Swiss-Prot record:
Species in which this protein is naturally found: Polaromonas sp. (strain JS666 / ATCC BAA-500)
Domain of life: Bacteria
Name of the molecule in the record: LexA repressor
This protein's UniProt keywords: Autocatalytic cleavage, DNA damage, DNA repair, DNA replication, DNA-binding, Hydrolase, Repressor, SOS response, Transcription, Transcription regulation
This enzyme's EC code(s): 3.4.21.88
Family matches, as HAMAP family: LexA (MF_00015)
Record's catalysed reaction(s): Hydrolysis of Ala-|-Gly bond in repressor LexA
Gene3D superfamilies hit by this protein: Umud Fragment, subunit A, Winged helix-like DNA-binding domain superfamily/Winged helix DNA-binding domain
Gene that encodes the chain: lexA
Site (Cleavage) residue list: A117, G118
Disulfide bonds, paired cysteine numbers: none
Catalytic site: S152, K189
């Protein structure tokens, strides 16, 4: 089993999970690492062979009661790993495996606020402050944090005020959550490329898909590789 997905002993003092709960927690972490967003109840049910999404919901509620995750109402992807869960996962890795020292080092991530038109996203004037995290918390090491503004990605569990961990990239696969620059605006959306167009899809029915026509100013700034609740940093 990969050390990045072993939750069998979250912490010597943490909640004891059933085998099924461990499996669901692993699935959640894997989905966030792979796509930048947690799975839906239906996706959990399909992956684990449940007859309905209700069965997945029951297990999620149990994990929430144990304080391992937080459920956000009103969104199909409203599942968040709590800060103490992330910390316990890290402690578990340190305790059970001999990790290289560099994987335990602190990672300095600049927080990008509002981005001025025409300026590089990591220009000094955009950086509000720097946060430090254990690098082993991220399977793909991010380059910076972006403060989320608005609710267009609500159903992916990404809401206003969250901090999105972003890996700089100029290419993306369909379905990945990306940070993109369209003209003077920087936005977080799900990426889809068709034969002639690029579509940036919201995860909220109240918002419209952004269609980028050939020749329009467009630049991919990075891929979402993690999500941090702003309240975790208070």
């Amino acid at each position: 089993m990969s050390i990045l997905n072993d939750f069998s002993h979250l912490s010597s003092e943490g909640p004891k999970l059933t085998a099924r709960q461990q499996q669901i927690l692993e699935l959640i972490q894997s989905a966030i690492t792979r796509t930048g967003a947690p799975p839906t109840r239906a996706e959990i049910a399909n992956e684990l062979g449940f007859k309905s999404a209700n069965a997945a919901e029951e297990h999620l509620q149990a994990l929430a009661r144990k304080g391992v995750i937080e459920l956000v109402s009103g969104t199909s992807r409203g599942i968040r790993l709590r800060s103490d869960t992330l910390r316990s996962i890290h402690e578990s890795r340190v305790k059970q495996f001999s990790l290289p020292l560099q994987s335990l080092a602190q990672l300095a991530l600049p927080l990008v606020g509002r981005v001025a038109a025409g300026s590089p996203i990591l220009a000094q004037e955009h950086i509000e402050q720097t946060y430090y995290f254990e690098s082993s918390l991220f399977q793909r090491q991010p380059d910076y944090l972006l403060k989320v503004r608005g609710m267009s990605m609500r159903d992916a569990g990404i809401i206003d005020g969250d901090l999105l961990a972003v890996k700089q990239a100029k290419e993306a696969r369909n379905g990945q959550i990306v940070v993109a620059r369209i003209g003077d605006e920087v936005t977080v959306k799900r990426f889809r490329r068709t034969k002639h167009l690029i579509e940036l899809l919201p995860e909220n029915p109240d918002f419209k898909t952004i269609v980028v026509e050939p020749g329009e100013p467009f630049e991919l700034e990075g891929l979402a590789v993690g999500l941090i609740r702003n309240t975790m940093l208070i």
